[in-house]
Amino acid sequence: MSNLEGKVVAVTGAARGIGRAIVKGFLAEGAKVVALDMSWTPSGLSGDDNDDYVKELEVKQEDVLISTVDISDSLSVERSYIAALDKFGTVDTLVNNASLRQRNLFPPTGKITTLETKDSDWEKMFGVGVFGTLKITRRFIQPMIKQNRGSIVTVISGGAMHTAIGGAYVAQRSGSSEGPYQSAKAATLTMMFYLAYEVREYNIAVNTLIPGNSRTTGYDEQNDARRAEGTTPSSSARISMRPEHMVPLTLFLADQDANSGVTGKCFDVTIWNMEHGLGSPKTWRDPDADPA
């Protein structure tokens, strides 16, 4: 029997992409899932063009709570939190996966320079990625504090933490043109490092993970737009992977606690998968993605 059998896991950004894969992964392990997202209506974009997934969750309604939430709104978060406790009585793990993608804020390519942005662009990005993550965490961590055990897993981005190889720590910008998005992820990473230290006394593990290059909702449209303007969508070294490559490490971290497990760490999912015999990016390659 899985250690996650019967555990209650809340997942933000659960309707599509990485969140969808994570929800399915937890259900396969026998966990009960609070699936949180701002919209459960298919967007029609690549990877999100039918409602079969929602129907699949509705069949498992004893083990799943589908909840519509705007994590940047405290009242919306509170409503979802109350609904989760009413249905399952507690929360054992929170997976912070929701964010505002740059391609949604600056369609269709997601590219913009710092001087081209407006204050409102940064406020929207940080409102979801940083303050939204804080609001949902601050609320859903309460049952974990009460039961003296829990786990917080937060998805960031490789662009949030870049270092040069050679011994000395040297910070550098991400290779992407996604300043607001990567800045929000960097702020979230720092926040989670501090939170891990602060809630260790409650036996709550707090960890972050960096996804590989994932083919998520709108990925194809973004690459088409970048190709149309003469920008190479991805280098030959980057392989577009299925969101499912995120699942094994997420499941592992969900079962951690601060006293006997791993906490305060940031993991590169691709490297972790290879180290644990789960394959290289080629193993997880999406056959329908752009050829690499």
Regions found by a protein language model. Give the residues of each.
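Catalytic loop of short-chain dehydrogenase/reductase
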Residues: 101-104, 116-119, 151-201, 213-214
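C-terminal helical subdomain
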Residues: 208, 226-292
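A short helix-coil junction within the Rossmann-fold of NAD(P)-dependent oxidoreductases
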Residues: 29, 87-88, 101-105, 139-151, ...
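A short, exposed helix-loop element centered on a Lys and neighboring polar residues
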Residues: 137-138, 193
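A glycine/serine/threonine-rich, flexible loop-to-helix segment
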Residues: 44-49, 108-112, 165-169, 201, ...
